[in-house]
Amino acid sequence: MVFVTTTNVLLSMSGAIAAIVLWKVISILRAPYTSALRNLPGPPSPSWPLGHLKMMFSAEDSAALYESWVERHGTTFKYNGWAGTYRLFTADTRAVNYIQSHSNDYWKPEISRFSLIQILGHGLLSVEGDRHRQQRRVMNPAFGPAQIRGLTEIFVEKAHKLCEFWRNELSKNGEPGRIEVLNGLSKMTLDVIGLAGFNYDFNSLNVDGKPNELNEAFNVLFRSLDGFAILPVLQAVFPPLRLLPDRRSRRIASAVKVMRRIGMELISNKKAEIVAAAISDQKEKNKLQSRDLLTLLLKSNLSRDNPESQRLSDKDVLAQVPTFLIAGHETTSNAVAWCLYALTQNSEIQQKLRDELWSVPTEDPTMDELNELPYLEAVVRETMRVHAPVPATERVAIKDDVILLNTPYIDIRGQVQDSVRVRKGDHIFIPIIAMNKSKALWGEDAFEFKPERWESIPDAVQTIPGVWANMMSFLGGAHSCIGFRFSVVEMKALVFALVRSFEFELAVPAGQLTAKTIGVQRPAVRGEQNQGCQLPLLIKVYKRN
């Protein structure tokens, strides 16, 4: 009798799973014939099962690919996803502004949220709706101008530590020495987010070369995410497949376990400090006036003065630790790497910047002193424009909607359209890098690295709905990068210290360098894929006359 009951349950479960899979398959197969996007122009699909997805994921120069599509099909068109389904591609500034300002109606796709939750938990980057607003509201105080001003000392200190790290390398091998700079930059920015985010020194830039446990976890994580894999996509679409054991998931789980263990240690230690200070004298309380991210979150969480709706649960606090460990150092380290690459391609720009940096009478500038350097500002802006660390973002419509456009398009029936109708579930691709390098917005020299352009930018650029500097690198709206001020000032501090201290040349022919996107756009060398992402430079100490 028990056997019969168990068999019936298993059969019922199998039938339910089969029904879900069948419904999903039928929905996908009929989608191209009923899609509201079917009459948009667009590039022909290179593959029925994969559409344009593999091409977009593996493109060496995604900006050039997107710009070629825009030149041929306009700023708004359709492209192909899985199994012939249609997706919306738009670089139209009015459309993008609308999507960003209606974040309740346009969420990250299921596959993105599944991947982010798998790695980060339910942190700020992976949640939507009310939960996102709650987390963002509590975290905003950590990233205001006053807070970043107080953290600049950490940025400068760790930038000097990186200079010392590289000088040590040069003393061993002579000058100019070949140094893979991405590794050092990643360690430096990890140390920064440790101190500024959690008041914890990871000491990644240790000269004895001992591997840092957290850095090793990151390396495992990003190696696991490398490449175009079908299974994670299927797991996002068909949740029962997430139960399947696979090597990639096991490696990610192992790396995440390390990140979360360190996160719990940080939270436990900080909680103990806050509780001890609460029952101690004023002197002890003054020691906890730190406004690092973790202190602010835990003070908010432990305070009885705040209404329940403004507090984060312990689970939500824990989710922010890996979120900011990854987001707080990966984007900045790669942005500075691309900045150094750009400076190797134009020695005049490099020297002009160096001359300005040496005009500052201190090697330990404040945030205000960094912000008063116009050419440094221009170089940082141009780096973030031309080499945006995150080259694109994607959203899914949560309801049927109509999106108005700045630039009309001609549909495949020859009719002019000034809006796009989307249906619930439609994917929308926003090409950050293509908008940053659009010739229609920036002029014919849009692909050139030209800091002088910031002396007078075109009027059309004012329509770009980014939170910073009329570009999309930090997005806009409710999901704009909460740490953009943090990132910009940290980047300035790094460039200030490095370019004052060293001269840089590319160690390989420029044609060998390429970009590899694993969430973040990283430099890599053709023919050296086994060495992972890297930026080898020839470095020598700058000797001022």
UniProtKB/Swiss-Prot annotation:
- The organism's place on the tree of life at top rank: Eukaryota
Give the EC number. 1.-.-.-
Gene3D superfamilies in the record:
Cytochrome P450 (1.10.630.10)
The protein's topology relative to the membrane is: Single-pass membrane protein
Residues annotated as glycosylated? 301, 436
Compartmental location? Membrane
Q: What is the residue range of the signal peptide feature?
A: none
* TM segment ranges: 9-29
GO cellular component terms listed in the entry, alphabetical order: membrane
Annotated keywords: Glycoprotein, Heme, Iron, Membrane, Metal-binding, Monooxygenase, Oxidoreductase, Transmembrane, Transmembrane helix
InterPro entries noted in UniProt: Cyt_P450, Cyt_P450_E_grp-IV, Cyt_P450_sf, Cytochrome_P450_monoxygenase
Entry binding sites for heme: 481
Q: Which cofactor does it need?
A: heme
Q: Molecular function (GO) terms listed? A: heme binding; iron ion binding; monooxygenase activity; oxidoreductase activity, acting on paired donors, with incorporation or reduction of molecular oxygen
A Pfam family the protein falls into: p450
The family classification in the record reads:
Belongs to the cytochrome P450 family.
Question: What is the role of the protein in this entry?
Answer: Cytochrome P450 monooxygenase that is able to use carbazole as a substrate for oxidation.
* Name of the protein this chain belongs to: Cytochrome P450 monooxygenase 197
- What is the protein's species of origin? Postia placenta (strain ATCC 44394 / Madison 698-R) (Brown rot fungus)
